[in-house]
Amino acid sequence: MPGLSWWDEEPAEDYLDAFRSLVLPQTTVLVGEHHQLWRWLLPEWSGNKPPTARDIARAAADAGTPYTLVTGLAGPSEQHVENQLATPQGILVSVSFERFEGVFVGAGETLSAALTGLLALGTELETAVSEALGYLDQALAHGFRPGMGHVLPDRLFWAQTDVTEDDDEQDLPATSNTR
């Protein structure tokens, strides 16, 4: 689910309506941040508490999407964030990670790409979600700020080598990442 905060309201609404009617019926797993999905799928929500991942999954299922991965839910503490794969019947996977400082750009895209790749390889949905979330957590942990702006996930964190004291590795460049 792309962020549309920079769009004017009317074109954004037209886009969201088209997305709802044309794309959701063709979607197996909808991936999105809790507040974005809430505003889009449940704009008239009147509950005393924010909608749960299951509430959002019900709304997505009404449009033809059987699974919804909701990210950015309040975790068990202020320092944690919860991510849940839900259906209208219940929560299939719930993974909690430590919350990172900073504002990230590309986290949702990184998660969606990782999940898509794992599913394309034939990984079971619940396993793919857990692995994709673990990959995202590491990409964010190794994230970098290329300038004065937001932090980008380091999607190639796994390919970086750490410099050790071994003589054979003294010529390798050191890697440095900032959060």
Regions found by a protein language model. Name each.
Residues 92-105:
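Short pre-catalytic strand/loop immediately N-terminal to key active-site residues, enriched for Gly-Thr
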Residues 1-3:
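N-terminal glycine-rich phosphate/adenylate-binding segment common to multiple enzyme folds
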Residues 126-179:
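Charged C-terminal helix
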Residues 36, 72-76, 98-101, 133-136:
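Glycine-rich beta-alpha junction loops
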Residues 39, 102-125:
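Short, small-residue alpha-helix embedded
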Residues 91-93, 118-132:
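Phosphate-handling active-site elements
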Residues 7-91:
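Conserved phosphate/ATP/ADP-binding segment of small-molecule kinases
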